[in-house]
UniProtKB/Swiss-Prot annotation:
Keyword list, A-Z: Adaptive immunity, Coiled coil, Disulfide bond, Immunity, Secreted, Signal
Coiled coil as UniProt keyword: yes
Quaternary organization: Homodimer. Interacts (via the Fibrinogen C-terminal domain) with LAG3 (via Ig-like domains 1 and 2).
Protein name: Fibrinogen-like protein 1
NCBIfam families membership: GGGWT_bact (NF040941)
Disulfide bonds: 85-114, 250-263
Organism from which the protein derives: Mesocricetus auratus (Golden hamster)
Residues in the signal sequence: 1-22
Superkingdom: Eukaryota
GO aspect biological process, one term: platelet aggregation
Annotated gene: FGL1
Length: 314
């Protein structure tokens, strides 16, 4: 009888053990299925993220191709502070690109494009190239500067404040490089270029002209027009700060900031049209003595350099 009882107990224990094992095995299988499903979900999410990253990288490449190759930016490591691009050039850095400068009276360092071609040492204060940048800006924008200081040939205005700080350091030459849509190029150069301070409303002053584009700034091309077309000693005007000699607001009509008289024979900050244009006013990128009032130029570079600049050939 005792043997039978022992046999039954062993049998019951074995059966319970099998049931417990089966239950545990079932739980393990369920856990495995759950983990396998989670892994599949994570793999799906990773693939989706990879696809999204690839899409964003493609879009970025398209944008860069559309904007043009990034230009060089040179960090000179703070070895010394340069007042303008001519000092950088004569310190042995001969490659065009963006550099940091700090004019003598400036409280801040700022970026600028240095044109190290054409004799080298040119500080670019304005550039037009493709019409991407809006030049119909308010006084504060023109005072502090705006535009693309990264891309190759990016359009920008260095800022009246910065141009004043540069030109008050000494005697500067302004060179203006102009190109039309027929791939012709001209230039205009002025000695003794200077932009006054804020109290003078950033008044424009310049000296003797030389070049191939004609002297649009002084208005001497036609004595009867000079009194209203000359930009000499004109204050800077914007749509919200009217300092011109016109009964209306030249900056508002021409949709740009500039040293307007009544109104202009040159407006290099004008609306970007492609060559000949029709508008209510002559508000294009205009250099009258080359293409007249009703032709808008393709590209403009305004750049300055000390009059007494002697390039270091080493």
């Amino acid at each position: 009888m005792g043997e039978i009882r022992s046999f039954l107990l062993v049998t019951i224990a074995l059966m319970m053990g099998r049931e417990i094992w089966a239950l545990e095995n079932s739980k393990c299988l369920l856990e495995q299925e759950r983990l396998r499903a989670q892994v599949q979900q994570l793999e799906t999410r990773v693939k989706q993220q990879q696809a999204r990253i690839a899409q964003l990288m493609h879009e970025k490449e398209v944008q860069l191709l559309d904007k043009g190759q990034e230009d060089n930016f040179f960090d000179l490591g703070g070895k010394r502070q340069y007042a303008d691009c001519s000092e950088i050039y004569n310190d042995g850095f001969k490659q065009s690109g963006f550099y940091k400068i700090k004019p003598h009276q400036s409280q801040a360092i700022f970026s600028v494009y240095c044109d190290m071609s054409d004799g080298g040492g040119w500080t670019v204060i304005q550039r037009r190239s493709d019409g991407r940048e809006n030049f119909n800006r308010c006084w504060n924008d023109y005072e502090n500067g705006f535009g693309n200081f990264v891309q190759n040939n990016g359009e920008y205005w260095l800022g009246n404040k910065n141009i004043n700080l540069l030109t008050m350091q000494g005697d500067y030459t302004l060179k203006i490089d102009l190109t039309d849509f027929e791939k012709n190029s001209r230039f205009a150069q002025y000695k003794h270029f200077k932009v006054g301070d804020k109290k003078s409303f950033y008044e424009l002053n310049f000296g003797e002209y030389s070049g191939t584009a004609g002297d649009s700034l002084s208005g001497t091309y036609h004595p009867e027009m000079q009194w209203w077309a000359s930009h000499q000693r004109m204050k800077f005007s914007t749509r919200d700060r009217d300092n011109d000699n016109y009964k209306g607001n030249c900056a508002e009509e021409e949709q740009s900031g500039w040293w307007f008289n009544r109104c202009h024979s040159a407006n290099l900050n004008g609306v970007y049209y492609q060559g000949p244009y029709t508008a209510e006013t002559d508000n294009g990128v205009v250099w009258y003595t080359w293409h007249g009032w009703w032709y808008s130029l393709k590209s403009v570079v305004m750049k300055i350099r000390p009059n007494d600049f002697i390039p270091n050939v080493i």
